[in-house]
Structures are given as structure tokens and as C-alpha cells.
């Protein structure tokens, strides 16, 4: 009895899946300190570890909170932890959470003043602000119609900077506004949006006189929300808004010039790493947020003014040959920069602008001309996916010199309108990524959680650029006890199924794994790229996201059911169907309905969106059908199931094995000749066959899509059948009209399994109204005998008088 009770208790703990982590509080902490944090959400049962995407933070004292809605921990932040956003996930015994963020800063934290019940602010008027010191980070909330005021003391000539992390905290579309006010409540500096910080803001000013200054924080339209958290940095730190040059070569030592700070340009020498990174300006203290720097092996030139026309295009001498890059700034009003380069005939070049992608406000427009003829060759405004950076593919028509110009779409300019133009050959590239599972939830199924002793199929999507190739898919760093099976990817496939299978004794653990695709012929490789969209809004686009080449992969606690797939050992033929049998093996105590989908289908093969194994059942049939042009081939298919855990404790997701499915050539084709009849008049439908492959024995033929009141019995055919007449019975009330959807299902049996062909689509049966019955000829009726009354005889008309008689008569009178 005790053992049974222990089993039931342990099994009940299994029925809690997909931990839902919503926020980590506080939203950040100071480097070199320990911070007690709370993970809040739902179904946070039995926390195991925090998965960090960047180094610099360690965890101790990870423990469950008072219920499944919270987890407590202590973050130990290293003194050399990178400033800014740190991405992480919480792994519980039964799953891995969505990615959430924690921000590391350089200053100690201050909490916004609240009443004892934490319901109201104590800093919502200019007259009664919250007093703070410089070089602190305030953790606050911008409520609806809320304005938060913080007062700080400053000296004349001192730099006072403020920067806010709001939207970038990744909860909602928060648009903060910040201002620095003097004692008379006049704004001496303010900012709403900035290209560098997206919808977050920052401003900096040289203090005009000693005294108290007030910092105002609010939502720009006063549309606050209890989830509009912010981190407000206040201090004497530098706050430049741009850096030049914006790029360099790997390992190169260059001098960066940070501009936009009120004290003037800040110069800083730096050795560039091997890949793109972000640089902090340091002047006493550091900028809270860094500025992006691109790293590329391309040779580059920094612009030299004047270069505002094709004749003045830079450089005038020693023209660089493509590939090359140019750096510049559209600094003056209406500025247009021109550059010269040398091209060779038939070079396939891609001209790519980096502006918004390196957080410049520039909305670029580029045009390319031949220096010899001064004729325009091509131009472009927005082409880069996700940002309004220009991109232009250009085939050099002949050897010679060419000029390219760049300007802002609206003619804007400024010291922060920095750009980089890369002119380089179009190189082939490949990569893979997990496609979004839901339009408004970019994180759904973006982690790979495999129940112990079970399986999961994921379907990466392939991106090929300037190459068509087959691919091999490999991994590095999977958890112990987890095996991956991936097919060889044909060049015509843009998606493919990958099976992960966890051993029954696999340790519950996780890793940040990397995956690679490789063209076995050329040796070209590409990464598995992932973009987590923290804040995105339908057609408005993505406001804050995180890009990574690491995927969270975990072995989690065992699931209460498993899935098996049976694929008949016969081919699926074009215009045919095949039934897949899906069996669920349920553990005692679990009997929830199970929704089953086929996550990947071979080309030309279709299936229902989903099928369901209802409560009390353990089997379901999923029917595949093939288009007429489905390519012949051998494929691997599997199915994935989702079910709600008992007591609604999350979603369970797992898959079957991958099983071989053959799409083969059809055995025959047929055409249905048009037939016509009348209601109540039986007739025949003639089908003529085109035998493509011999088959053994007899096949069954069934005529489908007959109208109401019309039936046809199944028929038998053989491999040598050329034509068949199918008797049809037509009732008196059969639907009249032209019925043009008839088709025949021909079922051939092979090794006891059916091979269904659906053929002759568009066959026509016309049921005409019966002709009207001929009218009977009526016999003429005999007229009734009527006795006529004798009418008085009329006097005969008088004979007209002749002229002579008329004269005689007149004379007599």
C-alpha cells in the first residue's frame, strides 16, 4: 500500500509541465554584488537550475517559493560581468521556461518610494520628489497617468546624465520619457526616443549652476501600466550617442571617437575582437548601454570631406577595388556623400548599408553610377529585412570606375548619422532556425525539452543564399543520454524533421547546444540562428529582440504517455492516400485527450491540421494524401502530440519515432467519360484505364462523389483492364443537374495493405429532367342541333335607278 501511495504521489508530481516564467524581480543589479531575486510565473515546480546565455552571473540558494508561482534565488554577479542585458531561462524538473532577462549595471540600486501597502507612489509631484544621490540606478514603475520625480544635487560645470531601460526590459511596448528640470521646473534637457536605445531614452547636460535638479520619468503618453518597470541610471557617466568609425577588422587596434556627449568627443583606443560586439565609452565611469561595432575582414576607408558630388567623390586618387567598405557621417543639412571604387566586368557585388542595424538614425538611400558615363545604374531605399538599411545587388557591366552616393530619405543629418557601406561579392550562405509556432508568440517551442524515455521532433527551417545545395545537420553539446537523428537534407527542401530521443536513464539536465548545417560538396557551413522577440506588435514589427546561436536543450522528467506510429509498408502514390495509425500508451492515472499533428510533411503531401485521441481511447488514424505532382522519394515522417497535464498543470509535448514513408509511382490512371440520364432511369458510367505498372490480383474500384439519389456498387478490376462500365442506380428523386466532381478510388492490395489511388477527378454525370409527356389528341365534339326560328324574310334590296329613270322621276315631281 505504501509503495502504491508513493507511486501515485510521484506520478502526480509528473503532471506539471511547461513552467511559465513571466518576470524576474528585481529587474537588475550591480556588478560585484549579490542580489536576491524572485522568479514569478506559474507551474514553477521543483526548480533545478538557471540557464545563462552570457557569463558573469552565478546562482546560489535556488529554491521553490511559497507555492508554484515563485522561485527564490541569489544571483552572484561577478565584478567583471558585462554591463547590460543578460538572458536566461529557468529549468524545472518538468521543463524549460521562456527566455527572460536580468540587467547588470555599475551603480547601486535604489527602489522607488512607495506607501507601506505598496499601492501608491511617494514621488508623484515636483514639490515632493524622492531624494537620491548621483551614480545610482532607480528601480521604478510607470503607472497610468503617473509621473515620477527624483531630486539630485549637482555642481556647476558637472555633467549630469540619465538613461532609462524600459522597453528593453522586454515585458511590454513601454515608451518612456525622461527630462531634467531645474529648480524653476524648466526643462534643461529631455528625451523621448533615441535611435541608439530604440524607444528607451537618455539625455545628458552640463549643469549651469549649483543646486538641486529634478529628474522626471513617465510614459510618453501617460499610458502607464503596473508592468511598465524601468531602471533609471542617474549620475555623471558619459552618454555619447554615436561612435566613429563604426567598424573595423578582427584583431585591429583602432581609435574610436564617441560623439554626442555634452563634454565633447571621447576618444578611446581598442583592439577589436573576432566578431561584432558593443563598446562602452569610459570617462570616469562607463556608459550604461554600449554602442554596436561591426567587425569584418573587409578593407575600409573613412570618408574625407568634401565629397558631396560625383566629381568630388572620395577618394580621388588610388581608387580601391571592390571588395571594399566606406565609413562616413551625414553631418550637415542635406548632406550627400559620394565614394569611388573600381569594378571588374561581371563581378556580382552586393552593396549593403549598415546604419539602423548599428543604431544610427539614418534611413539610407543609395544610388550607383558609372563614372565614365555618369549614367545611373541602380538605386535602393529599404531592402534589409527588419531594418530600413539599403541593399543593392549589382553586376558590374564593364571594367571601370564607379561612384556610389548615400543620403537620408528625408534629408536629415547630424553627428550621429553614422554609416558603413560594404561592397563585396555575393557570397553563398546557409543557416537554419526554428520557425515561429505562433504569430504572436515568438518563443513558443523555441527550446528543446525531451521527456526522459521519450522523443521530440523539431523542424528547423533552412535559409540558402546564392547557393542550392544538399545539407547535413550536426550538433555539439547535447545533454548526456540524449540522441539526435537528422536526415540528409535534399536541395529542394526548406524544412526537415530532426528527432531527439532521451534514454530512460538519462540525467535530468540541460545545455546550450550549438547546431551546424554543412554542404557536403563545397564544405560551406552555417549556424543555427535564433531570434527571441521580447517585444513585438503585429504589423508594427519587433521592438526588442535577442539573437543567439545557442539553443536550450534539456532532458526533463518523464511524461505520462508515449506515442507510437505505424506507417504501412506500401507506397503513397500521387493522387492517393495512406492511413497512419497512431497509438498512445498511457500511464495509470492519465486519460486526457491528446492532440496529434504531423509537424513535417514530404513535398506534395498533405494532412489534416490535427487529429485527436479522445479520453478513453488510445488510437487514431491520420490520413495523408498526395498531390498529383508529389515527387517520388523515400522520406522519414513522425507525429507530435500535445496534451494538457492533469489538473491543467501545463502542456505535455512529445513525439513518435521517425518512420520511413515511400512516395511511389502510381499503378494506373483513368478517365471518366461523361454520362447522362433522367431521374429514375439507371445508366452506366464508363471509365477507361491507363495501366502504368502491373499489380497482382484484383483491385477494388469505388465511384465517389455521386449526387443524391444515385448509387454505384464497388467493382473489381485487374491489371489488364482497359475499360469498365460501372452500373449506377438512379432514384426518382435524384438531384437534377450537371454533377462534375465524380472520381474513382482504386484500391490495390499489396502484402495485405491497401494502396489507394483517387483518379479521374472531374468526371461528369448529367441528370436531365424527364421530357414532358406528349399531349393526347382530343376528338372533335359534335355540334348540338339547334332549331332555328324562322326569321322574317328581308325585302330584296331595290335595284338602283338608272340615270334616265332618275331624270324621269324628278320631272314627274
Each PLM stretch: what is its role?
Residues 3-13:
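Bacterial N-terminal signal peptides
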Residues 16-142, 218-229, 233-322, 327-331, ...:
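Ser/Thr/Pro-rich low-complexity tracts
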Residues 17-61, 66-70, 79, 90-93, ...:
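Acidic, Ser/Thr/Pro-rich low-complexity intrinsically disordered segments
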Residues 23-26, 243-245, 434, 444-446, ...:
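Surface-exposed, proline-enriched loop/turn segments that connect beta strands in immunoglobulin-like
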Residues 31-37, 82-87, 148, 252-255, ...:
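Short, solvent-exposed loop/turn segments enriched in Ser/Thr/Gly
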Residues 63-69, 80, 195-197, 207-208, ...:
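Short proline/glycine- and polar residue-rich coil/turn motifs
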Residues 73-81, 268-272, 459-463, 467, ...:
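Extracellular/luminal low-complexity segments enriched in Ser/Thr/Pro
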Amino acid at each position: 500500500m505504501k509503495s502504491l501511495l508513493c507511486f501515485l504521489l510521484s506520478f502526480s508530481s509528473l503532471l506539471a509541465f511547461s513552467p511559465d516564467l513571466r518576470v524576474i524581480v528585481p529587474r537588475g543589479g550591480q556588478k560585484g554584488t549579490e542580489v536576491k531575486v524572485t522568479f514569478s510565473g506559474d507551474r514553477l515546480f521543483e526548480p533545478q537550475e538557471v540557464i545563462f546565455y552570457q557569463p558573469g552571473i552565478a546562482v546560489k540558494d535556488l529554491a521553490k517559493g511559497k507555492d508554484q508561482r515563485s522561485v527564490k534565488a541569489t544571483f552572484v554577479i561577478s565584478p567583471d560581468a558585462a554591463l547590460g542585458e543578460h538572458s536566461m531561462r529557468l529549468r524545472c524538473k518538468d521543463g524549460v521556461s521562456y527566455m527572460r532577462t536580468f540587467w547588470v549595471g555599475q551603480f547601486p540600486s535604489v527602489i522607488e518610494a512607495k506607501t507601506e501597502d505598496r499601492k501608491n507612489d511617494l514621488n508623484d509631484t515636483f514639490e515632493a520628489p524622492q531624494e537620491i544621490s548621483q551614480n545610482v540606478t532607480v528601480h521604478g514603475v510607470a503607472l497610468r497617468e503617473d509621473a515620477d520625480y527624483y531630486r539630485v544635487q549637482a555642481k556647476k560645470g558637472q555633467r549630469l546624465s540619465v538613461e532609462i531601460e524600459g522597453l528593453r526590459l522586454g515585458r511590454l511596448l513601454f515608451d518612456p520619457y525622461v527630462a531634467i528640470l531645474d529648480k524653476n521646473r524648466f526643462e534643461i534637457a529631455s528625451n523621448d526616443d533615441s535611435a541608439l536605445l530604440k524607444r528607451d531614452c537618455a539625455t545628458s547636460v552640463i549643469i549651469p549652476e549649483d543646486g538641486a535638479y529634478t529628474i522626471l520619468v513617465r510614459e510618453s503618453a501617460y499610458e502607464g501600466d503596473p508592468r511598465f518597470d524601468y531602471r533609471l541610471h542617474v549620475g555623471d557617466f558619459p552618454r555619447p550617442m554615436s561612435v566613429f568609425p563604426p567598424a573595423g577588422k578582427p584583431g585591429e587596434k583602432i581609435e574610436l571617437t564617441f560623439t554626442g556627449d555634452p563634454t565633447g568627443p571621447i576618444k578611446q583606443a581598442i583592439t577589436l575582437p573576432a566578431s561584432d560586439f558593443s563598446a562602452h565609452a569610459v570617462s570616469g565611469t562607463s556608459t550604461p548601454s554600449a554602442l554596436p561595432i561591426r567587425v569584418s575582414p573587409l578593407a575600409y576607408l573613412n570618408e574625407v570631406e568634401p565629397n558631396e558630388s560625383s566629381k568630388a567623390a572620395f577618394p580621388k586618387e588610388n581608387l580601391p577595388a571592390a571588395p571594399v567598405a566606406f565609413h562616413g557621417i551625414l553631418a550637415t543639412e542635406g548632406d550627400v556623400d559620394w565614394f569611388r571604387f573600381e569594378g571588374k566586368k561581371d563581378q556580382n557585388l552586393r552593396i549593403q548599408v549598415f546604419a539602423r542595424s548599428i543604431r544610427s538614425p539614418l534611413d539610407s538611400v543609395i544610388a550607383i553610377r558609372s563614372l565614365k558615363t555618369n549614367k545611373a545604374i541602380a538605386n535602393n531605399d529599404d531592402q534589409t529585412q527588419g531594418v530600413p538599411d539599403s541593399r543593392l545587388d549589382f553586376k558590374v557591366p564593364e571594367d571601370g570606375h564607379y561612384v556610389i552616393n548615400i543620403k537620408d530619405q528625408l534629408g536629415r543629418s547630424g553627428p550621429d548619422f553614422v554609416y558603413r557601406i560594404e561592397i563585396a561579392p555575393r557570397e553563398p550562405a546557409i543557416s537554419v532556425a526554428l520557425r515561429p509556432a505562433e504569430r504572436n508568440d515568438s518563443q513558443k517551442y523555441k527550446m528543446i525539452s525531451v521527456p526522459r524515455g521519450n522523443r521530440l521532433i523539431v523542424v528547423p527551417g533552412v535559409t540558402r543564399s546564392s547557393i542550392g545545395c544538399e545539407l547535413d545537420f550536426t550538433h555539439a553539446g547535447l545533454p548526456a543520454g540524449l540522441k539526435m537523428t537528422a536526415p540528409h537534407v535534399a536541395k529542394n527542401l526548406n524544412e526537415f524533421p530532426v528527432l531527439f530521443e532521451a534514454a530512460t536513464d538519462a540525467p535530468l539536465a540541460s545545455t546550450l547546444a550549438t547546431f551546424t548545417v554543412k554542404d557536403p560538396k563545397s564544405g560551406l557551413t552555417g549556424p543555427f540562428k535564433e531570434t527571441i522577440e521580447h517585444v513585438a506588435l503585429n504589423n508594427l514589427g519587433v521592438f526588442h529582440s535577442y539573437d543567439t546561436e545557442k539553443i536550450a536543450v534539456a532532458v526533463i522528467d518523464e511524461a505520462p504517455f508515449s506515442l507510437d506510429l505505424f506507417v504501412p509498408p506500401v507506397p503513397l502514390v500521387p493522387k492517393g492516400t495512406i492511413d497512419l495509425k497512431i497509438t498512445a500508451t498511457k500511464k495509470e492515472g492519465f486519460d486526457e485527450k491528446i492532440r496529434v499533428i504531423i509537424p513535417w510533411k514530404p513535398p506534395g503531401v498533405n494532412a489534416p491540421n490535427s487529429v485527436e485521441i479522445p479520453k478513453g481511447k488510445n488510437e487514431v488514424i491520420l490520413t495523408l494524401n498526395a498531390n498529383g505532382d508529389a515527387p517520388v522519394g523515400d522520406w522519414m515522417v513522425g507525429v507530435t502530440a500535445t496534451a494538457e497535464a492533469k489538473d491543467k498543470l501545463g502542456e505535455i509535448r512529445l513525439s513518435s519515432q521517425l518512420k520511413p514513408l515511400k512516395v511511389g509511382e502510381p499503378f494506373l490512371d483513368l478517365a471518366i467519360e461523361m454520362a447522362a440520364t433522367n431521374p429514375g432511369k439507371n445508366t452506366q458510367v464508363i471509365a477507361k484505364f491507363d495501366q502504368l505498372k502491373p499489380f497482382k490480383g484484383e483491385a477494388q474500384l469505388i465511384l465517389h462523389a455521386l449526387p443524391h439519389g444515385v448509387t454505384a456498387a464497388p467493382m473489381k478490376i485487374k491489371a489488364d483492364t482497359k475499360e469498365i462500365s460501372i452500373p449506377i442506380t438512379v432514384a426518382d428523386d435524384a438531384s437534377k443537374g450537371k454533377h462534375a466532381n465524380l472520381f474513382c478510388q482504386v484500391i490495390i492490395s499489396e502484402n495485405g495493405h491497401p494502396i489507394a489511388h483517387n483518379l479521374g477527378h472531374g468526371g461528369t454525370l448529367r441528370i436531365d429532367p424527364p421530357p414532358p409527356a406528349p399531349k393526347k389528341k382530343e376528338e372533335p365534339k359534335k355540334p348540338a342541333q339547334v332549331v332555328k326560328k324562322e326569321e322574317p324574310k328581308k325585302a330584296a334590296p331595290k335595284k338602283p335607278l338608272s340615270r334616265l329613270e332618275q331624270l324621269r322621276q324628278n320631272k314627274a315631281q
